[in-house]
A protein has these predicted regions:
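Short helix-onset patch at the extreme N-terminus, typifying the N->h transition
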Residues: 6-8, 48
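Beta-propeller-forming repeat regions
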Residues: 16-385
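Hydrophobic h-region of N-terminal signal peptides that target proteins for export
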Residues: 9-17
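Positively charged n-region of N-terminal signal peptides that target proteins for export
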Residues: 1-4
């Protein structure tokens, strides 16, 4: 493992600005997910990523490595892989700091201790029956004022009792001693194929947040190749109604809700991360509109105002280092312009977040088959200075 250096690779935008690529770590194996927060309280972003059979915190801005957990036998009934497939942050135990949640066959959490860089973080199980969890996101699903966890269970009935399903999980009253979290399967067997990433938001304006998902298909994953959303009922612990947005979508992976054109209706931004193309669905009828049919394997997606003009833009990257990292500039009315900011950089996970505290959103990338974690520096406020 190598870390802590700056690689200057300049990629021009259409307007002439350039994004600099900062390398946080390089590995001998795949890195699928990375998250950022300030854990040591120095006002600078740190990064947690899973690689080389470990979960590691990289202390910014020099990116010194602190091992938080080493995967091994006996921690769960499921054999772990060398790295998590996805991760997120949540203050699980309500003590005011960000704990780490990961999916590595088992969904687990690591408790952030008072001495955050002083040694391992305590490993605890969230759920060991949910398998094939490509996405973990947090939100208040039942609107009780407490943050919940949303996780897909994308494996078949041969491997789990919750096959091809979507779930949300409540934190138990005492998460330190609980054997698992409180699981609600809201789409039981209703998400066939290889379900990937989820989105959260009230789509139909009934005041209850809904959940979206996408799934790739193929011979190994029958029933996939769709984008869909599930409507939350009055009782969120019961089954939710599925609404298909589109079928015959080879490689479908990502779908996130937002009002993209400023008309007051929720739209969806989507990608085919195991196929080709970026698109959006214009609400309320969800008319499918192709944005960039050429980009290959746009496996990661995040939404954010990247140019600080008051509307939401999007960023994605090819999962393997075969194509580009690009953001799509929104004119506020749903017309998107592709801006290439890197090339030959793989990404399984991309986050739009201000990494250098300069007031604009940068791009944090877990490089997948590029075997690295990098961040791309938004030049917006550099130009203004």
């Amino acid at each position: 493992m190598r870390n802590s250096y700056l690689l200057i690779l300049a990629f021009p935008l259409a307007v002439g600005a350039q994004w600099n690529k900062h390398v946080i770590v390089e590995s001998s194996g795949m890195i699928n997910s990375a998250v950022a927060a300030d854990w040591n309280g120095d006002g600078r972003m740190d990064v947690i990523a899973s690689l080389d059979d470990k979960v590691i915190l990289f202390e910014g801005p020099e990116w010194g490595a602190h091992t938080l957990h080493v995967f091994g036998s006996g921690q769960s009934r499921n054999k772990p892989r060398s790295a998590c497939i996805h991760s997120c942050l949540m203050d699980v135990d309500g003590d005011g700091d960000q704990d780490f949640i990961g999916s590595n066959n088992t969904v687990f959490w690591l408790e952030c201790p008072a001495k955050r860089l002083g040694g391992p973080w305590k490993y605890r199980t969230v759920d060991d029956e949910i398998l094939g969890t490509h996405c973990l996101i947090t939100a208040d699903v039942n609107q009780d004022g407490q943050i919940d966890l949303i996780a897909n269970s994308g494996r078949t009935a041969e491997k789990t009792s919750i096959p091809n399903s979507l779930t949300w999980l409540q934190v138990p009253q005492n998460p330190h001693s609980a054997e698992c979290w409180i699981r609600h399967v809201f789409a039981r067997g209703d998400a066939p194929g290889a379900s990937h990433y989820t989105g959260f938001g009230d789509v139909n304006g009934d005041g209850r947040p809904d959940i979206s998902c996408a799934a790739k298909g193929g011979d190994a994953f029958p029933g996939g190749e769709w984008f869909a959303w599930w409507e939350q009922p009055k009782d969120p612990t019961q089954a939710w109604e599925k609404h298909l947005l589109a079928v015959n979508q080879p490689g479908a992976t990502n779908i996130m809700p937002a009002d993209l054109d400023g008309d007051g209706h929720t739209d969806y931004f989507a990608t085919r991360g195991h196929g080709q193309g970026v698109l959006w669905f214009k609400g309320p009828k969800f008319v499918q509109i192709e944005i960039d049919p050429e980009i290959i394997f746009p496996h990661s997606l995040d939404l954010g105002d990247l140019d600080n003009d008051g509307d939401l833009d999007a960023v994605t990257s090819s999962k393997d280092p075969v194509d580009v990292t690009a953001w799509y500039e929104n004119n506020g009315r749903g017309k998107f312009t592709r801006r290439v900011i890197a090339s030959k950089q793989g990404s399984y996970d991309t986050r739009a977040i201000d990494m250098d505290n300069d007031g604009d959103k940068d791009i944090l990338i877990a490089g997948h088959t590029s075997n690295n974690v990098v961040w791309l520096e938004n030049p917006l406020n550099n130009q203004e200075r």
